[in-house]
């Protein structure tokens, strides 16, 4: 039986628990600092199991001790973006929150794999790794799966085809300098540049980069949670099933892509040990330049941390 703990019972956390419960991993613990919220949502989700047909045990708690012996811990805690805010605006507040969260993960679930979802994603994942003291391959961030999903959705909409036929790839930082890769994006195996003109692809790339902000502006309060939770569960499933799926993730680089000592979105193999392998792709010069700028932004953010 697999035990999964989700830290943060807000929209992303609770929706993730719902999707995970339907996979029937065994046990899920949802924890939050707000008294009553994780307990109430857990009770609601347990009752949904009688209707949707899953027997997953779901516990809501305010006590970190309840995450003890978790196989997988998913961090969704922290404040969300508001209109006009960038992911980088969240550095100071969320780094303190996640530093505390990570310390409790190290204390109660020292053998777990950790997926971070809190923004600014690449910087906060670095905080989580440092604060837990875990090996870097056991701590990684959810970024590219979500960004690639948005890219794929826009492509399917443009081509009027099934989303199931689109396989997209997005790398780089989870922010304004992410790098969608049309040359590694296919529709039923057909490279995207064979199906759409360059100007159209550029437009879809731009919308992908601004995909999260577009939703924030429309919602006025809060940020996306349905697509992020779907992306989290895709990654979690690869870990708990040891399927070694090739997915983009924010991984700790030690020389790959010319970067060292930072977290960065790259294609990886995900399995029971976390990041089993980092895959390096040949990139165009313009894409390499954006990646360089993205890495500089991440390094600048890390330099502001007090860890």
From Swiss-Prot:
Q: Which NCBIfam families match?
A: MalateDH_bact, PRK06223.1
Question: Is NAD tagged as a keyword?
Answer: yes
GO terms classed as biological process: lactate metabolic process; tricarboxylic acid cycle
EC id: 1.1.1.37
Alphabetical list of SUPFAM superfamilies matching this protein = LDH C-terminal domain-like (SSF56327), NAD(P)-binding Rossmann-fold domains (SSF51735)
Q: Which UniProt keywords are present, listed alphabetically?
A: NAD, Oxidoreductase, Tricarboxylic acid cycle
Q: Which family does it belong to?
A: Belongs to the LDH/MDH superfamily.
Q: Sorted alphabetically, which InterPro entries does this protein's record hold?
A: L-lactate/malate_DH (IPR001557), Lactate/malate_DH_C (IPR022383), Lactate/malate_DH_N (IPR001236), Lactate_DH/Glyco_Ohase_4_C (IPR015955), Malate_DH_type3 (IPR011275), NAD(P)-bd_dom_sf (IPR036291)
Sorted alphabetically, which CDD domains does this protein's record hold?
LDH-like_MDH
What does the entry list as the binding residues for substrate? 81, 87, 119, 150
Ranges annotated as spanning the membrane: none
Q: Name one GO molecular function term.
A: L-lactate dehydrogenase activity
Q: What is this protein called?
A: Malate dehydrogenase
Q: Which sites are catalytic?
A: 174
- Report the top EC class in one word: oxidoreductase
**Species the sequence originates in:** Methanosarcina mazei (strain ATCC BAA-159 / DSM 3647 / Goe1 / Go1 / JCM 11833 / OCM 88) (Methanosarcina frisia)
Please describe what this protein does. Answer: Catalyzes the reversible oxidation of malate to oxaloacetate.
What does it catalyze? Answer: (S)-malate + NAD(+) = oxaloacetate + NADH + H(+)
**Which residues are involved in binding NAD(+)?**
8-13, 32, 94, 117-119
């Amino acid at each position: 039986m697999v035990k999964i703990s989700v830290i943060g019972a807000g929209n992303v956390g609770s929706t993730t628990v719902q999707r995970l419960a339907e996979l029937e991993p065994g046990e899920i613990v949802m924890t939050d600092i707000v008294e009553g919220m994780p307990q109430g949502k857990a009770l609601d989700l347990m009752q949904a199991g009688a209707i949707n047909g899953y027997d997953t045990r779901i516990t809501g708690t305010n006590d970190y001790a309840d995450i003890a012996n978790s196989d997988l811990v998913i961090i969704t805690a922290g404040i969300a973006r508001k209109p006009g805010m960038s992911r980088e605006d969240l550095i100071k507040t969320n780094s303190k929150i996640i530093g505390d969260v990570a310390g409790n993960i190290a204390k109660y679930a020292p053998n777990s794999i950790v997926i971070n979802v809190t923004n600014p994603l690449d910087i906060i994942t670095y905080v989580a790794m440092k604060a837990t003291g875990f090996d870097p391959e056991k701590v990684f961030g959810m970024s590219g799966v979500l960004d690639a999903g948005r890219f794929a959705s826009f492509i399917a909409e443009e081509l009027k085809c099934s989303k199931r036929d689109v396989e997209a790839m997005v790398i780089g930082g989870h922010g304004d300098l992410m790098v969608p890769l049309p040359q590694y994006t296919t529709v039923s195996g057909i490279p995207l540049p064979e199906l759409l003109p360059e100007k159209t692809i550029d437009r879809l790339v731009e919308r992908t980069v601004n995909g999260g902000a577009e939703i924030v502006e429309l919602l006025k309060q809060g940020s996306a949670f349905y697509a992020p939770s779907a992306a989290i569960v895709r990654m979690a499933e690869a870990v708990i099933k040891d399927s070694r799926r090739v997915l983009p993730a924010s991984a700790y680089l030690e020389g790959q892509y010319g970067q060292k000592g930072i977290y960065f979105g790259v294609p990886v193999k995900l399995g029971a040990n976390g990041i089993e392998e980092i895959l390096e792709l040949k990139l165009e010069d313009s894409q390499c330049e954006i990646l360089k700028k993205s890495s500089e932004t991440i390094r600048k953010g890390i330099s502001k941390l007090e860890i």
